[in-house]
Curated annotation (Swiss-Prot):
Annotated GO CC locations: vacuolar membrane
Pfam families in the cross-refs: ATG22
Membrane topology: Multi-pass membrane protein
InterPro entries: Atg22, Atg22-like, ATG22/LtaA_families, MFS_trans_sf
Protein function: Vacuolar effluxer which mediate the efflux of amino acids resulting from autophagic degradation. The release of autophagic amino acids allows the maintenance of protein synthesis and viability during nitrogen starvation.
PANTHER family: AUTOPHAGY-RELATED PROTEIN 22
Region (Disordered), start-end ranges: 1-98, 638-679
Protein name: Autophagy-related protein 22
Keyword Transmembrane carried by entry: yes
Family: Belongs to the ATG22 family.
Signal peptide limits: none
GN (gene name): ATG22
Chain segments annotated as transmembrane: 110-130, 178-198, 211-229, 233-255, 330-350, 361-381, 398-420, 424-444, 464-484, 496-516, 530-550, 569-589, 598-618
Length: 679
């Protein structure tokens, strides 16, 4: 019914630690560039535009090396500090070339290719087709012998009970409407397990792009394979849904892992060097003298123009602004592609007379779109290999051993992050609320589509229009909620509560159908098909606000410097929660033999997060997060010292403490817990 939640980058607002005021410095762009050496990197899997510039880069490296020979030891030390401020590490095969427009286009193209699967397939035509295929193999519930009719066939009295169907799957009798719900639960479970297992490969080694393309091809071809699904092999449709949904989720995790790298190496960031206190103490006089010498340079040579060095706070602001700009553009491009494909899908369904064949043709088109427009992404997106695992000796063996090493490391990192999160009460409150809320969001979408198909007898083209309306309203909501919150003076958690109140209207509206006087009216309470359209607009508008503000609120609670690990936990909570809602709704449908009672469950699921959000104290969460960050930073300082000594920190460093956001042992964790509780 609605597209995937837009994943705007976090914009946490924190009070900066008191620092000694920094004095703006001027420096020559040429002098700054001479200190940067861009390592030549080659791979059989790299983008086509990477080798074309190798000669010019080699020449640049040569010039850079000669300039580096004349730089002072303090300048080299400052360069290392600079690189750490960007979040980067020095390691073998690091690709530090500036982000190109072609590389950005490749990143956008994958969103353009794959977002259509969310909007047109998994949120619309796949659940419709799965229910239709199950119905073709089912029998009427009333006698368990008569074959079922199409769910959108109108009965003379307009009743719903006579058209309820059941189908036998693996020896179990289930309602045809719950068949799709159980399928989605299985797919989300596998997706959550896979996302955790590959998260390490997304950040380490040279597997990021290879895995992204592998999952893209698997997902797109599994969607195209729906053209071969027929009544006799309807279970194949469920298997393809599981494969495609799991592949899509994994590919988008890998795509999102490119975003920090694109931002970090963007020219706007590369040439915005942070100022440090040490630089001012030891280099201010020399730097100003060098900068002043360029005032006499040719006034027509822009390359020698002077530029103010940014403070660390300013550099962070630039990075967040650029990250938001790139991510928002990718979301917008994906939404536009999804709406365009959905309009074509409606035309196909109209042309082919609302048959299951028309739905299979639509899915063939969606899969082909995903596959074809992944090709430019494969050509233009650079591999950008990450640092090796701290246990590098294990991962370097390759093959199955490397896979096991990466998977075990990923699960260890997850458990370590959870051990940190449970010590922060406001993080726990938020993740509990987000677990319930994200489950309600996903379950409401699939339940509403199936209710409209089986209870309201809406035809496939009308069901597709529900998705179009919801997506359009979601785009409007993403931009409107910021204005609404400013206008009403709402804080982020208050805006989330306002969204929850509006969201609660959807299941409550469905429950109105139980009221006797509403039943007598024959309208309202989801008794007429047209009522789905305004509800779809409300759903999309609410989703546009929740997606952004939940990430923003969570960002304010994260310990400074641990954003990546905690946002991974945020994503896993989002994926993992969606296992339960569809399964419970499926059980309700099987027990009651209709879908409307599921609105009771949805009303509870939507309302439960509200008190948890209400009791979140952002100020308290910031203080506790900063105290925890101080302990984490102690281990990171040890890692930096190991790096300066020319060795990569490993799990064996520091008395066996493994890396954990930085790593900590049990004694550190107990000390932190006492600090937080003793505030």
């Amino acid at each position: 019914m609605a597209p995937r939640n837009p994943e705007l980058p976090p914009t946490p607002l924190r009070h900066p630690q008191p620092q000694r005021p920094t004095i703006p410095r001027l420096f020559s762009r040429l002098s700054h560039a001479s200190k940067r050496s861009f390592r030549s990197y080659s791979s059989s899997f790299e983008a086509d535009d990477e080798r074309s510039g190798s000669d010019s880069r080699s020449q640049f490296d040569s010039d850079s090396d000669s300039d580096m020979d004349t730089s002072t030891e303090r300048g080299q030390s400052r360069e290392r500090r600079c690189r750490r401020s960007y979040g980067g590490e020095q390691y073998a095969d690091e690709d530090t070339r500036p982000t190109s427009e072609k590389e950005l286009a490749g990143w956008y193209m994958y969103s353009f290719a794959a977002e259509t699967y969310v909007i047109c397939a998994i949120s619309s035509f796949i659940p419709i087709l799965l229910e239709s295929l199950a119905r073709e193999n089912g029998v009427l519930l009333k006698d368990r012998t008569s074959p079922c009719k199409a769910s959108y066939d109108k009965t003379p009295d307009g009743g719903n009970d006579d058209n309820q169907c059941v189908v036998h799957v693996l020896g179990m009798e289930i309602n045809t409407a719950s068949f799709a719900m159980y399928t989605f639960s299985v797919s989300v479970l596998l997706q959550a397990l896979l996302v955790v297992s590959i998260s390490c490969a997304a950040d380490h080694g040279n597997y990021r792009k290879k895995l992204l393309l592998a999952f893209a091809w698997i997902g797109s071809f599994s969607v195209m394979a729906y053209i071969f699904v027929s009544k006799e092999i309807y279970l194949l449709g469920a298997i393809l849904a599981i494969i495609s949904n799991t592949s899509f989720g994994a590919s988008f995790v890998l795509l999102n892992s490119f975003l920090p790298l694109l931002v970090r190496h963007h020219p706007r960031i590369e040439y915005a060097e942070p100022a440090t206190g040490d630089d001012l103490d030891f280099e201010s006089e020399d730097q100003m003298r060098n900068s002043a010498s360029h005032l006499l340079a040719d006034e027509h040579d822009d390359h020698y123009a002077l530029s103010r060095v940014h403070t660390k706070e300013e550099l962070t602001s630039i990075e967040l602004q650029l990250s938001t700009e790139i991510s928002a553009k990718g979301i917008g491009i994906g939404y536009c592609a999804g709406l365009f494909v959905q309009c074509i899908a409606i035309a196909i369904v109209f042309k082919l007379k609302n048959s299951t064949w028309s739905q299979r043709v639509v899915l063939l088109f969606v899969g082909a779109w995903w596959a074809i427009f992944t090709i430019p992404a494969a050509m233009w997106l650079r591999p950008r290999p990450g640092p090796p695992l701290p246990a590098a000796s294990e991962s370097s063996r390759g093959g199955v051993a490397a896979f096991v090493s990466y998977t075990l490391y990923a699960w260890k990192a997850l458990f370590r992050t959870v051990s940190l999160a449970r010590r922060l009460i406001d993080i726990v409150l938020f993740l509990g609320a987000w677990f319930l809320l994200s489950d309600a969001i996903a379950t409401t979408s699939s339940t509403a589509i199936l209710f409209a198909k089986t209870q309201l007898r809406m035809e496939p083209w009308a069901l597709a229009m529900i998705n179009v309306i919801s997506t359009t309203a979601g785009i409007a909501g993403a931009f409107s909620w910021a204005f609404i919150s400013r206008r009403l003076g709402l804080r982020p958690h208050q805006t989330i509560l306002a969204c929850i109140v509006l969201f609660e209207l959807i299941p409550l509206y469905g429950l109105m159908g139980y009221l006797p006087f509403v039943k007598n009216w024959g309208v309202l309470g989801l008794q007429k098909p047209w009522e789905m359209f305004p509800l779809a607009a409300v759903y999309g508008f609410v989703l546009g606000g929740l997606s952004g503000y939940c990430r923003s609120l969570f960002g304010e609670l994260i310990p400074p410097g641990s954003e990546a690990a905690f946002y991974a936990l945020y994503a896993i909570t989002d994926k993992g929660s969606s296992i339960f809602g569809p399964a419970i709704v499926g059980a309700i449908i099987d027990a009651t033999e209709e879908i409307r009672p599921a609105f009771w469950f949805l009303a509870v699921m939507v309302g439960l997060p509200a008190p948890l959000i209400y009791f979140i104290d952002v100020d308290r969460g910031k203080v506790e997060g900063e105290k925890l960050a101080a302990v984490i930073e102690g281990y990171r300082r040890h890692q930096d010292e190991s790096f300066d000594d020319g060795r990569f920190p490993s799990d064996d460093d520091d008395d066996g403490r493994g890396p954990i956001l930085g790593g900590r042992d049990d004694e550190d964790e107990h000390d932190t817990e006492r600090e937080v509780r003793g505030r």
